[in-house]
Amino acid sequence: MLAGVVSPEARFERELEHFRHDSNAAAQFLYAWVSFHACANENKGIRRGVNERALFWNTALGAFQTSLFIVLGRIFDRNHQNHTLDRLLREATQNPSIFSRRALAQRKSRQSPGTNWIKDYVQDAYVPSRKDFARLQRFASGKRKVYERVYQKIRHKVFAHSGISSRTQSDALFAKTNIRELERLVVSLGQLYEALWQLYVNGRKPVIQRPAYTVAALRRLGRRRDRHIPSIQEAMVNETYAVLALYDQS
């Protein structure tokens, strides 16, 4: 390969890593915010402690909210030169050979040179079709519609630019939001990343799961005694509750 020419695999890996970073960040910011409110509403001692340091917590909550909308804007940006969800899916659909069994075997061989299990492993690997990529594109398009219908305007007019001149106008925009819808949107981005990662790294069919997304459901998962690996949103919920528990004087 010529110097300076980036391979399709390297481009896809780069875009996938950007998407991982941004989708995780969106989950961290959102679930820190919603977990804070859920936890504070449940406990008088915590509310009292928070109110004693109201300036700090208002600053932190404002930062979570601003950062969430900014990172969602990055993910759904339509500029093809930026690191976006569109660019990630374009790299995948335009370079299907990177998902072939041969390409998977080469990647596994680089990771584990000298092993003899790879040949048998890749025989069962899933090779995506155009229908698979079209399905992923439809899924992403549906999520984009949710973002653009309500949340894009808030991102542009409230957080990224000073396009709103009054509190009344700002409140009118936020009145159109739905916290459950926003939770589903953010969690779905992580599931899309997981589907693409499993396809590329392990040769598994890209399936979008429907995981728990409410704070209550994530709290129940956190109390399980099995050895499951927590999602970023579950970890954020658990850590937020743990931090706020320090205020509990009851």
Language-model segments: residues:
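Amphipathic alpha-helical interface segments
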Residues: 1-146, 172-250
